[in-house]
Amino acid sequence: METVLVAGFLCVYDDNDINDNFYLPRRTIQEEINSGNGLNIPLNINHNENAVIGTVSSLSVYSTVCFVARVQSKEFLTIIKKIAAKSKLITNTEEKTLPPDPEIECLNSIFPGLSLSNRVGGNERDPFFKHVSICGVGRRPGTIAIFGRNLNWILDRFSSITEAEKEKILSTDQSCVQFFAEEQFKVDLYDLLADSLDTSYIKVRFPKLQSDKQLSGISKSTYIKASENLTANNHTINVNSKVTKETEATDSVSQDDCAVHAPDLISTICSTTHTTHHDLVRMNGSATGNSASLPAPQFSECVFLPKDTFCSLLNATAGAQNKNVTPAAPIFKTDEYITPYPESLSRVDYGNRMNYHIPPPYWYPSMPGFNYKSYRGSQKRCAPTDSDDEMSFPGDPDYTTKKKKRYREDDDRELTKDKNDIKELVDAIGMLRHEISALKYIRSQSPQRQHCTAVDTMPTIEEKNVASPKPSVVNASLTPGQDRNQNLMQSDQSLLSLNKKLFVEALNKMDN
């Protein structure tokens, strides 16, 4: 694969309108070059560090900062070669003196700008030159790139480079030993397509390239698609304002004059790019109207207009032409539809709405809100209490209803319930006393009274069982008197223990 070189200016010191943010001090650049930091600087695409395509072989400072680099990435050159083979306009150059080289022309068309990435402040130990990028257009004035196969041919394109400076650049380039690894180029065709898409959104690209070409002193034929060299003083472009001097005179023209000369101005503006309408017609072999018979105007005849002025000229031209207006459909009047029932206003014809009687809205009295909370409270069941499960005694007036669920509605019912519980306890104690008195009376009438002790000193069944052990011998006699006395005593003891148990439970309940 043949060698591809690129050269150009990274900064032009003769320009007085340079921005301070992009200013490169001449003394700092010279010191960095003398210290050997100006060689083997990476060359990439649009400041993408993953798209390194070569290295810088020469960097020198004169009236400009001139650099020379070699494109060494084989994969990148293969992509450019395929793009150039697919393009139908890339080899259609007006300059027949240049040798046909689709790859070089493709590189000059896609990446005509240069940009140097350098250190601004920060750590002084970091390298001053970070990388050089080829791009769609550079920010610094005069930063335009020229690709070629021969370095002498590239340097001859710049009229501002003297013969002595050219010899120094050639000697520095030949003595430089370059190192490049193919792994540094990590992008593909989609990344390059995205860069081209971003470049197409730059509005001032072509005026900036025209100014850079004039400022760099490129006088001979090149592959750059940045229009012809500007020589007329009346058409000198101001980079900051991006408006020609003839624009001021155009603004003072009246609206009638603009309408008369609008077709000429429009055809003149369309010829500012390198590929004019005349060229496209000549390539395709056909045209509409009389456009094919009109010669392509020269660049000195071009007039640059602001966007607002151009749009106003288009509107004036469109208004002056006769237009066949399509008549609108006739509007037929519709009869009013009368119904025996009143309709809503939206269903009445628009023309009859003013005469339509709308009844006033009916006023409904406000209804008091329903007290839902009180209704829920009255139907809510109270929490169960211990009194619901207590034992009932015979003779109790609430004996049959004591197991039913109770509900309390307010505090008065709760107080009444507490009083009833106390009354029940008093009645139970009275019944226990009555039972004890009856038991004492029965015991006093028993014929075996002398064998019984008093109730107050009589031990319980548990104490009797503990105190008196069971007899070891059981008699099987049928003495009627003894069995009767034993059965009576056992019934008395069981009834007494039951009453005591109930009495203890009643006392425990009163304590709680």
Curated annotation (Swiss-Prot):
UniProt region (Interaction with pAP), positions on chain: 264-282
Pfam families listed in its UniProt record: Peptidase_S21
Site (Cleavage): A226, S227, A476, S477
Top-level taxon of origin: Viruses
The EC number(s) this enzyme carries: 3.4.21.97
Active site: H47 (charge relay system), S115 (charge relay system), H131 (charge relay system)
Region entry Disordered, spans: 376-407
Annotated region described as Interaction with major capsid protein, given as residue ranges: 492-512
GO molecular function: identical protein binding; serine-type endopeptidase activity
Matching InterPro entries: Herpes_virus_sf, Peptidase_S21
GO terms (BP aspect): nuclear capsid assembly; proteolysis; viral release from host cell
Protein keywords: Host cytoplasm, Host nucleus, Hydrolase, Phosphoprotein, Protease, Serine protease, Viral capsid assembly, Viral release from host cell
GO cellular component: host cell cytoplasm; host cell nucleus
EC top class, as a word: hydrolase
Motif (Nuclear localization signal): 402-408
Family of this protein: Belongs to the herpesviridae capsid scaffolding protein family.
Notes concerning its domains: Region of interaction between pPR and pAP is called Amino conserved domain (ACD). The region of interaction with major capsid protein is called carboxyl conserved domain (CCD).
The protein, known as: Capsid scaffolding protein
UniProt organism field: Human herpesvirus 7 (strain JI)
Gene name of the encoded protein: U53
